[in-house]
Curated annotation (Swiss-Prot):
The keyword Cell membrane applies. Glycans are attached at residue 33. Odorant receptor. This is Olfactory receptor 52I2. Residues 77-84, 151-169, 248-267, 326-350 are cytoplasmic. Residues 1-55, 106-129, 191-226, 289-304 are extracellular. Disulfide bonds join 127-219. Pfam families: 7tm_4. It is found in: Cell membrane. It is a multi-pass membrane protein. Keywords: Cell membrane, Disulfide bond, G-protein coupled receptor, Glycoprotein, Membrane, Olfaction, Receptor, Sensory transduction, Transducer, Transmembrane, Transmembrane helix. It comes from Homo sapiens (Human).
């Protein structure tokens, strides 16, 4: 979601200031499969200019996807099976792991299929379903980062009232609110783009059905959907970042008000995992934004697409590792769970 903000702005400038036909020729190259009606399917190019490296990319993405699935599944299972881990922080982490699974599974299997076998075809409905779930997952994740920041604020600034403020009902309400907010924000965008007339090329210069890449194929002016995405993304991400920043300002103020250095370090260490996850979410998005802003003359198109591809898999791969390494209790619970599964199965087998 956050990486759409400047991309949409760039697309708006292109369509308002430059002849649209020229833009289409620059972005899409020679004409492909021109039809006069909505195509039954789209063709995903993959990473243009890196076709010779597609096999190695498929191997790397497959490895990261397996790590992401295993890591996030273990976290969800370990937290779900341990009643002592049903605290707000662990519940939000469980939801984050589930969102990461949805994000990676929406994109990576098809991407690997394109890179390995060249199976680039994706049906019209599947393409927009993929786009919906990718944007939905990113919108939910930014909301989760906000709720986790609020959790850290209450834990550090109001520790005596922690369980009274973050009750199970409050946690459920917050989780439902960020999910409903994401659905309300993303559904109109998906509807607007899917109802654009696609009477020209059906070749998507991307590895998955990304909003901007699809909007460029439309015969009608895609500015309304791009403007909606720009305003919606700005409001959602901007407000989330503002509240996260406010939470951490209050957290730092409370931490540095402690007299003991040991207490200060202990308090800050409880925020380390959350800060790491935020960095994985926002920094790759910023890199993708700046790459789009600089344009193909500075950042080649294949680099822009590669950055967008990595953005959907790297956070899902590294988030479980960050929380597993930084959270001692969770690490011990995961290790205990793995030993239980491995040794109990081996004992049953013998």
């Amino acid at each position: 979601m956050c990486q759409q903000i400047l991309r949409d702005c760039i697309l708006l400038i292109h369509h308002l200031c430059i002849n649209r036909k020229k833009v289409s020729l620059v972005m899409l190259g020679p004409a492909y499969n021109h039809t006069m009606e909505t195509p039954a399917s789209f063709l995903l190019v993959g990473i243009p200019g890196l076709q010779s490296s597609h096999l190695w990319l498929a191997i790397s993405l497959s490895a990261m996807y397996i790590i992401a699935l295993l890591g996030n599944t273990i976290i969800v299972t370990a937290i779900w099976m341990d009643s002592t881990r049903h605290e707000p922080m662990y519940c939000f982490l469980c939801v984050l792991a589930a969102v990461d699974i949805v994000m990676a599974s929406s994109v990576v299997p098809k991407m690997v299929s394109i890179f390995c076998s060249g199976d680039s075809s994706i049906s019209f409905s599947a393409c927009f379903t993929q786009m919906f779930f990718v944007h939905l997952a990113t919108a939910v994740e930014t909301g989760l980062l906000l709720t986790m920041a609020f959790d850290r604020y209450v834990a550090i600034c109001k520790p005596l009232h922690y369980k009274r403020i973050l009750t199970p009902q409050v946690m459920l309400g917050m989780s439902m609110a960020i999910t409903i907010r994401a659905i309300i924000a993303i559904t109109p965008l998906s509807w607007m783009v899917s109802h654009l007339p696609f009477c020209g090329s059906n070749v998507v210069v991307h590895s998955y059905c990304e909003h901007i890449a699809l909007a460029r194929l439309a015969c009608a002016d895609p500015v309304p959907s791009s403007l909606y995405s720009l305003i919606g993304s700005s409001l959602m991400v901007g407000s989330d970042v503002a509240f996260i920043a406010a939470s951490y300002i209050l957290i730092l103020k409370a931490v540095f008000g402690l007299s003991s250095k040991t207490a200060q370090l202990k308090a800050l260490s409880t925020c380390g995992s959350h800060v790491g996850v935020m960095a994985l979410y926002y920094l790759p998005g910023m890199a993708s934004i700046y790459a789009a802003w600089l344009g193909q003359d500075v950042v080649p198109l294949h680099t822009q697409v590669l950055l967008a591809d990595l953005y959907v898999i790297i956070p899902a791969t590294l988030n479980p590792i960050i929380y597993g390494m930084r959270t001692k209790q969770l690490r011990e619970r995961i290790w205990s769970y793995l030993m239980h599964v491995l040794f109990d199965h081996s004992n049953l087998g013998s």
